[in-house]
Amino acid sequence: MSSGALTKPQMRGLLAKRLRFHIVGAFAVSLGVAAFYKFAVAEPRKKAYADFYRNYDSMKDFEEMRKAGIFQSAK
């Protein structure tokens, strides 16, 4: 047993160090997911709604539904 003395492991601040690392990682992942959702889902949806309502004629749609007999009060 002539091996040198083993160095003691650091026991203080392990939780704080680990939490700091994981909080930074979680923040980066959440920003990435938010950016992905904005550009992959929200922007195309907003564009689709804008395209639809740009050419939408509510009176024409109302007249088609009235002729189909959907409304009871508008005959």
Curated annotation (Swiss-Prot):
Membrane-side (Mitochondrial matrix) residue stretches: 1-13
From the record, give the transmembrane residue ranges.
14-54
Spell out the subcellular localization from the entry: Mitochondrion inner membrane
Top-rank taxon, per record: Eukaryota
Pathway, per record:
Energy metabolism; oxidative phosphorylation
Transmembrane recorded as keyword: yes
Q: Which UniProt keywords apply?
A: Membrane, Mitochondrion, Mitochondrion inner membrane, Transmembrane, Transmembrane helix
Respond yes or no to whether keyword Transmembrane is given for this record.
yes
This chain's function reads: Component of the cytochrome c oxidase, the last enzyme in the mitochondrial electron transport chain which drives oxidative phosphorylation. The respiratory chain contains 3 multisubunit complexes succinate dehydrogenase (complex II, CII), ubiquinol-cytochrome c oxidoreductase (cytochrome b-c1 complex, complex III, CIII) and cytochrome c oxidase (complex IV, CIV), that cooperate to transfer electrons derived from NADH and succinate to molecular oxygen, creating an electrochemical gradient over the inner membrane that drives transmembrane transport and the ATP synthase.
What protein does this entry describe? Cytochrome c oxidase subunit 6C
